[in-house]
């Protein structure tokens, strides 16, 4: 991968954290003065939840940038343009992402090689298996809820291995934007009100109020919000590197804030954090190569579902709806049943073999043989151990690609809105509540299913995630499709159906994302179907004994397709008013 490209990718992830409007750091970006030279759709594409931000990403491609550059500009412009609804991503960074969190990234270099970068949060050294057994709220709010953040070390890894520009140069746009501020949108105002309905911590806690209620009441639509402390924090990281975050005064302030909220994270926890470059996973589907990510993400779950469905040769062709929808749901149920055994590979010696088995011909054939076209079956058929499938929330996704064949599928998070609701007073860093993604022994979920031992808390362990960035190539190795989603446990089914809709149903990208979605994570034993499904399909599913509930999809998908002639198609999430994809 080109060093300049990775430098710009580093920039975007810091920009994710700034939660601020672009200032005169890059005035050309918003002037719309990019030359209106002719572009034939072969230069590249950006798909995001905001059409204007996608336009700015496309501008970067017009002036000679690449897919990573487009990611950068998208994230930069998103901070002032739009806030999506709850299921959707990081909402302006501070809601579901930032340097107090972590994530996963799948990168396809122009030469066709892949890298899966895991900068997921880890459990502190003092964490233990039963720490939330009698403290149910402790995993979502307060100091114990935070895992050791991985984002800054992840960016350091990218910069040192691929970077060329000076670290400070990479950081400068994010610093400027954090200090300048932006106008509160209707969406931001709505989310602030939603998050404070059971206690106005944004106004009543002085550390939060400095940004959100500087005059004593929550900022309203049209007001200017700034994050100057955060800008100063990024400035220090720019000058002194990632060690400024993980050691010294900044790290001490983080530890102090968490300990004041009953946390146990230490300076050693921060100092010892490392990112992991993990193997990718691949299968053949309809003659093409599908690449995704391995545990502790859920790319291998997506691949196992596709592997099973690959055995249905007339899937969504001879039968355009009902039976294929039933078969898809059954495959999804097997996939989520397999997911309950996943966890951090560092803590399981046989997890590599298990994942290989998940996407093997043998497993796919066996599970397909166990599917009945006449009815769905008891949960034990799909998950014999009766383990829970966590409803993990949060996340943000963007897909980009360019004419060189480079593509980036990126998802990050700090988990719930405002993470653990711990903000570091001195730095403005919002801490994650990723510890809630672990399973807790002895705490069966509300449906009576047991927690998964594979995802129990251990010191240094990374919790299981639903994230599954995906890239597909043709038999000749050329780029075909880039996709991913936000929406917690619905990420897998959202991404899956984007793939099925373009590859099996022969839809274009916009049609693929607009088509009604189904979600079934096995536990609870409910098939969620959007209202747009036709009555024939819904009635068929009910006749097959599925517990159908009509509900709007909780996933938001962003995808890009590259046609054989090199022309790109792109789409943001159609369920969002301002989402969009842009090709140039």
From Swiss-Prot:
InterPro entries: GGT_lsub_C (IPR043138), GGT_peptidase (IPR000101), GGT_ssub (IPR043137), Ntn_hydrolases_N (IPR029055). Its EC number is 3.4.19.13, 2.3.2.2, 3.4.19.14. Pathway: Sulfur metabolism; glutathione metabolism. GO terms for cellular component: extracellular region; plasma membrane. The keyword Zinc does not apply. It comes from the Eukaryota. One of its GO terms (molecular function) is leukotriene-C(4) hydrolase. Belongs to the gamma-glutamyltransferase family. PANTHER family: GAMMA GLUTAMYL TRANSPEPTIDASE (PTHR11686), GLUTATHIONE HYDROLASE (PTHR11686:SF62). This is Glutathione hydrolase proenzyme. It comes from Arthroderma benhamiae (strain ATCC MYA-4681 / CBS 112371) (Trichophyton mentagrophytes).
């Amino acid at each position: 991968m080109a060093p300049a490209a990775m430098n710009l990718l580093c920039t975007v992830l810091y920009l994710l954290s700034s939660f601020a409007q672009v200032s005169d750091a890059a005035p050309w970006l918003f002037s719309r003065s990019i030359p209106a030279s002719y572009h034939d759709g072969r230069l590249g594409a950006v798909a995001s939840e905001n059409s204007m931000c996608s336009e700015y990403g496309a501008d970067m491609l017009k002036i000679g940038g690449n897919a990573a550059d487009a990611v950068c500009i998208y994230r930069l412009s998103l901070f002032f343009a739009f806030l999506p609804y709850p299921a959707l991503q990081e909402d302006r960074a501070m809601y579901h992402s930032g340097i107090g969190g972590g994530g996963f990234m799948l990168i396809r270099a122009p030469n066709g090689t892949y890298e899966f970068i895991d900068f997921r949060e880890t459990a502190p050294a003092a964490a233990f298996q039963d720490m939330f057994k009698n403290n149910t709220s402790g995993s979502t709010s307060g100091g114990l809820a935070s895992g050791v953040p991985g984002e800054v070390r992840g960016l350091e890894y990218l910069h040192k291995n691929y970077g060329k520009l000076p670290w400070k140069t990479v950081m400068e746009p994010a610093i400027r934007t954090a200090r300048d501020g932006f106008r509160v949108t209707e969406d931001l105002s709505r989310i602030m009100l939603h998050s404070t309905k059971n206690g106005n911590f944004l106004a009543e806690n002085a550390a939060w109020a400095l940004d959100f209620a500087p005059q004593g009441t929550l900022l309203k639509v049209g007001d200017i919000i700034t994050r100057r402390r955060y800008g100063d924090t990024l400035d220090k990281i720019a000058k002194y590197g990632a060690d400024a975050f993980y050691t010294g005064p900044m790290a001490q302030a983080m530890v102090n804030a968490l300990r004041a909220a009953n946390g146990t994270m230490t300076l050693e926890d921060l100092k010892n954090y490392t990112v992991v470059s993990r193997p990718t996973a691949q299968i053949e589907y309809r003659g093409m190569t599908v690449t995704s990510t391995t545990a502790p993400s859920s790319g291998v779950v997506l691949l196992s579902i596709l592997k099973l469905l690959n055995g249905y040769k007339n899937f969504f062709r001879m039968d355009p709806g009902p039976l294929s929808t039933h078969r898809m749901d059954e495959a999804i149920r097997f996939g989520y049943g397999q997911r309950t055994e996943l966890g951090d590979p560092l803590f399981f010696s046989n997890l590599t073999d298990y994942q290989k088995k998940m996407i093997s011909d043998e497993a796919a054939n066996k599970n397909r043989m166990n599917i009945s076209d006449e009815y769905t079956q008891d949960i034990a058929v799909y998950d014999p151990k009766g383990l829970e499938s966590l409803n993990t929330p949060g996340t943000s996704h963007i897909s980009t690609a360019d004419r060189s064949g480079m593509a980036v599928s990126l998802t990050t998070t700090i988990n719930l809105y405002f993470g653990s609701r711990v903000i570091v007073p001195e730095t403005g860093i919002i801490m994650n509540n990723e510890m809630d993604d672990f399973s807790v022994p002895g705490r069966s979920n509300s449906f009576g299913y047991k927690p998964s031992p594979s995802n129990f808390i251990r010191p240094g362990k990374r919790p299981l995630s639903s994230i599954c960035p995906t890239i597909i190539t043709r038999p000749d190795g050329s780029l075909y499709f880039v996709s991913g989603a936000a929406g917690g446990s619905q990420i897998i089914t959202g991404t899956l159906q984007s793939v099925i809709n373009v590859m099996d149903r022969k839809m274009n990208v916009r049609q693929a994302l607009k088509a009604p979605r189904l979600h079934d994570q096995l536990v609870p034993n409910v098939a969620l179907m959007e209202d747009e499904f036709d009555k024939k399909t819904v009635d068929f599913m009910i006749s097959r004994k599925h517990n159908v509930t009509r509900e709007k999809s909780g996933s938001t998908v962003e995808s890009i397709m590259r046609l054989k002639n090199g022309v790109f198609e792109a789409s943001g999430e159609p369920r969002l008013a301002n989402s969009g994809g842009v090709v140039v």
